[in-house]
């Protein structure tokens, strides 16, 4: 009787994610303007429970700016994040327009030291639009007055996103 040994070869899959850090004055005027719009809409976020306000502004290829702020609800998780408010607004009202950039900012009653990243649901929603339009969406994240992080693509924030091919099986 022969004994069989099964060998499993482990393979490593690696994806590198890049965020570039800038100072405000190093950004171009369009990026600075989009960040300001995100701050403006952040101030009207409805966040009475978390006291953590988030604003998102995106710009379409036709130069239309769409804003969104988080909208909380006492019946968690019935609220919606700023990123999805903005991106779904764009999808509903400008379905054939390309989203070029999205700026995301947060205001809290404590000092923010690191970039506030979009939640997984928002990352997946933004990836869906990036894939749908066949063009990268630049993402701009402002941490505080000094530090701003930029990624050329939302996919850098969710390198192993759920793929639509998985639904076809």
Spans of model-derived segments:
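Short, Lys/Arg-enriched N-terminal segments with co-localized hydrophobic residues
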Residues: 1-9
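C-terminal binding/interaction regions
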Residues: 9-41, 88, 94-169
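A short mixed-secondary-structure module that forms the rim of ligand-binding clefts
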Residues: 73-92
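A short glycine/serine-rich beta->alpha loop
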Residues: 69-76, 108-113
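Short beta-strand scaffold segments in enzyme catalytic cores
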Residues: 51-60
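Extended beta-strand/beta-hairpin segments
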Residues: 44-50, 137-138
